[in-house]
Amino acid sequence: MTIYEGRRTIDGLVVTADGKRLDEHYEIKRFTRFGFEWTYEGESPQQLALAILFDRLADKERAIQLSEPFMKTDIANLDNDWKLTSEEIDAFVRGNPQAE
């Protein structure tokens, strides 16, 4: 099980997957040039959604397709410091009609 974590520090935002820095995956799709964000709907939160989904699914097209709904239902509602498990992400994918 992969654990994704985000926190706000004095040095900025930190997002990890099992303790390793999560890449923005701009090579797949660039929604923003400002990196990750969360707690609201927008381009930087969608970049985070894309990065998490691609890390979990290893499927560029599905990650792009699901990034907006995942951002709206999950990423926009995260607290300043948060944790998501791969099981929670899998549940989102299973429950999303666009995932097929």
Name these PLM-found stretches.
Residues 58-96:
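Short, compact, well-ordered microdomains
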Residues 11-69:
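Amphipathic alpha-helical packing elements
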Residues 1, 94-100:
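Short intrinsically disordered terminal tails
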Residues 1-15:
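Glycine-rich short-loop/terminal segments
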